[in-house]
Amino acid sequence: MAEFTSYKETASSRHLRFKLQSLSRRLDELEEATKNLQKAEDELLDLQDKVIQAEGSNSSMLAEIEVLRQRVLRIEGKDEEIKRAEDLCRLMKEKLEEEENLTRELKSEIERLQKRMAELEKLEEAFSRSKNDCTQLCLSLNEERNLTKKISSELEMLRVKVKELESSEDRLDKTEQSLASELEKLKSLTLSFVSERKYLNEKEKENEKLIKELTQKLEQNKKMNRDYTRNASNLERNDLRIEDGISSTLPSKESRRKGGLDYLKQVENETRNKSENEKNRNQEDNKVKDLNQEIEKLKTQIKHFESLEEELKKMKSKNNDLQDNYLSEQNKNKLLASQLEEIKLQIKKQKELENGEVEGEDAFLSSKGRHERTKFRGHGSEASVSKHTARELSPQHKRERLRNREFALNNENYSLSNRQVSSPSFTNRRAAKASHMGVSTDSGTQETKKTEDRFVPGSSQSEGKKSREQPSVLSRYPPAAQEHSKAWKGTSKPGTESGLKGKVEKTTRTFSDTTHGSVPSDPLGRADKASDTSSETVFGKRGHVLGNGSQVTQAANSGCSKAIGALASSRRSSSEGLSKGKKAANGLEADNSCPNSKAPVLSKYPYSCRSQENILQGFSTSHKEGVNQPAAVVMEDSSPHEALRCRVIKSSGREKPDSDDDLDIASLVTAKLVNTTITPEPEPKPQPNSREKAKTRGAPRTSLFENDKDAGMENESVKSVRASTNTMELPDTNGAGVKSQRPFSPREALRSRAIIKPVIVDKDVKKIMGGSGTETTLEKQKPVSKPGPNKVTSSITIYPSDSSSPRAAPGEALRERHTSTSNIQVGLAELTSVSNHVSSPFELSIHKHDITLQLAEAERMADGPLKDRPETVVSRSSIIIKPSDPVERNSHAPPAETIRWKSHSAPSEVGFSDARHVTVRNAWKSRRDLKSLEDPPTRIGKNVESTNSNAYTQRSSTDFSELEQPRSCLFEQGTRRVGPSSGDAPEPSSRRTQSSLTVSEVLTRRNRVGDTITVAAWNHSASMEEEGEDCTLSVYRQLHNSLDPSELPGKQGLPESGRVRAEERLRPTRPCAEEN
């Protein structure tokens, strides 16, 4: 009503206003008429004067008078009109007054209605409040029901426990009885032992007496023998003398006989004495031996009894412990019984609540209070139990506990979960107790522990059991997000620098199908291990292990411990990393024969964001070096679906301003999750081979994308760049581990598919990439702004759905969706002298779709073959270009821009679109092909260097045209150009995402030179995409070409090899940077 009345008022007021306006107009007209009348009157007066003056001319005057009369009549008629108008005005005034009164009444009505509305609103609010209260009450009721269910289940569990406790009590009683009987036996044994001891002591004393008596007898016998022998000798002498004196004449024979007889008698006597003495001695010796044996027996018995006494003491202590346990169990039982009663009361009350007998809120509050009380009680009981368990712990148990704690700490390092740590310690403690105690005691302690676990304050029984039974989720699944933060936390160890890799390598965990089962437990170590185990195994040990393929495993083992250190080390000055990279590069050259050692260097280089800056500097320095190094592409492929790990390493001398684009870029393409890092190598070392090796290393880092995209992508991309730049390029010869000593073109590296090992850990990379990749890249981009030598580092993750088909015909429609996220960091080359250097570092996050140049179809060249792809490629890329140096050869503007673009489109250009969708391998091949167009494949890497397309882009799924486009226009269209490219930067309005640009546009902008290359590259890249399900390219490329697209052609050669991987929106390296 109020609205209707207000509407009526407004309508009536409008009508009145309209009438007023018309009346005012009439009034104005009447006023004009009155003025005219006054003028006529004045004229009449004048005429009258004239008539008076000119009486003579009456006739004429009369005629005039007639005319005047007519005019007066007319004027009078007008006066009537004026009167009528005045009447109308009066009426209008009256009507207006009436309308005003009406409006006042309506206002009052409106106010009344508003008051009523306010009242109704209050009622509604009250109603909604009551509704909310009702819903809350319903929820609380449901909660209470759930609680009752839980409590009933807990009751059942408690009943079971009570039964277990009762059984344990029975067992304890039995053990007590057995112990008591054993004690009695021991007591009787001890009594018998004591009596035996007394008896034995008495025997010993008697034996001693006997021994003394025997010794005395022996001494007496000895004396008697001596006396007897003396007497016999005297008698003989006397007899001889007598015989001699009586008859010296007696025949000598008789005397001899007598002497012989006497002698025989003497001998017999002596022998008799000796035998008697010997008999006595033997008897005494035997007795002594017997006594000694008895003494030894007694001693052994005493020892046995002492050991029995100790056992008795132990048994007594155990008995006391068991009694304590029994008491604690009784207390627990009482607590449980009380809890059961409370729970029963709660259940009754809840039933009453459900029946509506008790008011809902009061019941809810009271039940809540009770629930909390039970919780506290549970805590108290748990505390008491813990006391008993502590008492039970023997030193051995404590030792076990310490061991468990260490173990738990180790687990925490890897799993980051407290639960995981606690559960093993519980189980170990229990096991230790069980081993040390008798079976009965073991069961008792287990019971107490169970109860303890049950009442652990933090968790209910079930939770405790879960924690015990299940390793933490982190331990069960590969650490993804965690690894990120962890890796950064890690201490910096040069050896550990694999930690950085670890991040990158998270995805690369599956790398080599090597032992990654262990990887999941080590969030950091995983990636490191995976990367280490992959052909890049050495990288974990960076400089140390480069020489040995076997080191991969070592790196994997050390990767976990080192991963953390590696991250920290990565933060070390990039100069450190660079020097290490150089070393690694040298080592890698030796190792090139071993495909496994290829990657190692790259991953080993720890670079943090700071390192990124250093890497950028390194890039600039490498450019300065002026060593044109062929780009080496290392592809490790264990299976088409396995992560392709391709590294395209391009080294170029920095000295050439145009060839700055040739900066060594390690482009790593992992078909699945591998991030391709293309980094112009910061290492000043001229050796292209070593750089290539190092670059190949970058691959493991690419894995970072999986989990670390948000936080880690930027850092990791930087790391990978550093690692790749520092690491020597490991050239992959075609399928053969060609020695790194010989520089390889990216095409050659691409050819060496055999070397490619799966770096990817199969993770749902698409999800990761699709959802957060762009944002993460944006976040990561921030650090990229660090000033550094001109470097473009791009981390591109491309997930081709089909990695199985190594190469897809450019015309083939790719059915897979390609999503790629790339972080591209372009550090302005601090050297302004290089004309082609991009002065602004920028990080590009490019989705593979962008990379695939899903340009707006309108813009795309109408390439049918790409359109053939049924699936639309969606690409999101965010590009942050922060110019570290405003000064750039190519007038790359320092302004930093963050550009994000998404394009959904089916590539329309045949050649370009094909290239766009081409997988990493195709991209590599395309690079080769492009190079082949420009140069023989072997020359490609060199050409790339020479072309100064240091920003040697990897496009796994990007059109070369797009890449080229990006160089000249990519950023222009897809993104606003951060800085105006020296010649190329289009207006910001033209900065549509390159994805929107047609490949042809990109190519044309870049340079026509790249077009054929891009087509070939796309064809290859398409097949590559199919092969590599997901390729993550972590490309750190310094776009040294700030050159106009015309300059780009040289770069295009790089893009051919490198761009393919680069997915280079970056491609526009210089131009792109300028545009961006």
Swiss-Prot record:
- Where found? Cytoplasm, Cytoskeleton, Microtubule organizing center, Centrosome; Cytoplasm, Cytoskeleton, Cilium basal body; Midbody; Chromosome, Centromere
Bias-annotated ranges (Low complexity): 569-578, 793-806
- According to the UniProt entry, which residues carry Phosphoserine? 255, 394, 425, 440, 512, 570, 574, 611, 659, 690, 745, 905, 932, 995, 1042
Quick one: where's region Disordered?
246-291, 358-546, 569-600, 675-746, 770-819, 862-913, 929-998, 1042-1076
Single Gene Ontology BP term? negative regulation of cilium assembly
Q: State what changing S926A does.
A: Does not affect localization to the centrosome or midbody during mitosis
What does altering S891A do?
Does not affect localization to the centrosome or midbody during mitosis
Name the consequence of T679A.
Does not affect localization to the centrosome or midbody during mitosis
Task: State a single Gene Ontology molecular function.
Answer: microtubule binding
Q: Which UniProt keywords apply?
A: Acetylation, Actin-binding, Cell junction, Cell projection, Centromere, Chromosome, Coiled coil, Cytoplasm, Cytoskeleton, Microtubule, Nucleus, Phosphoprotein, Tight junction
Point out the coiled-coil segments of this chain. Answer: 11-359
**Region entry Required for interaction with FLNA, spans:** 833-883
Q: What is its main location?
A: cytoplasm
Start-end of Basic residues biased regions:
368-378
Q: Identify one Gene Ontology CC term for this UniProt entry.
A: actin cytoskeleton
Q: Which residues carry this modification: N-acetylalanine?
A: A2
Q: At what positions is Phosphothreonine found?
A: T679, T958
Bias class Polar residues marks the residues at: 410-428, 509-518, 944-960
> In which residue ranges is the amino acid composition biased (Basic and acidic residues)?
253-291, 706-719, 862-871, 1058-1067
Q: What does this protein do?
A: F-actin cross-linking protein. Stabilizes actin and acts as a negative regulator of primary cilium formation. Positively regulates the phosphorylation of both myosin II and protein phosphatase 1 regulatory subunit PPP1R12A/MYPT1 and promotes the assembly of myosin II stacks within actin stress fibers. Inhibits the phosphorylation of myosin light chain MYL9 by DAPK3 and suppresses the constriction velocity of the contractile ring during cytokinesis.
* Disease linkage: Interacts with a truncated form of SALL1 associated with Townes-Brocks syndrome 1 (TBS1) and may contribute to the cilium defects seen in TBS1. The truncated SALL1 form promotes proteasome-mediated degradation of LUZP1.
Q: How does it assemble?
A: Component of the CERF-1 ISWI chromatin remodeling complex (also called the CECR2-containing remodeling factor (CERF) complex) at least composed of CECR2 and SMARCA1. Component of the CERF-5 ISWI chromatin remodeling complex at least composed of CECR2 and SMARCA5/SNF2H. LUZP1 is detected as part of the CERF-1 and CERF-5 complexes in embryonic stem (ES) cells where it is involved in complex stabilization but is not detected in the complexes in the testis. Interacts (via C-terminus) with LIMA1/EPLIN; both proteins restrict ciliation and may work together to regulate this process.
Q: What is this protein's record name? A: Leucine zipper protein 1
**Which organism encodes this protein?**
Homo sapiens
Gene encoding the protein: LUZP1
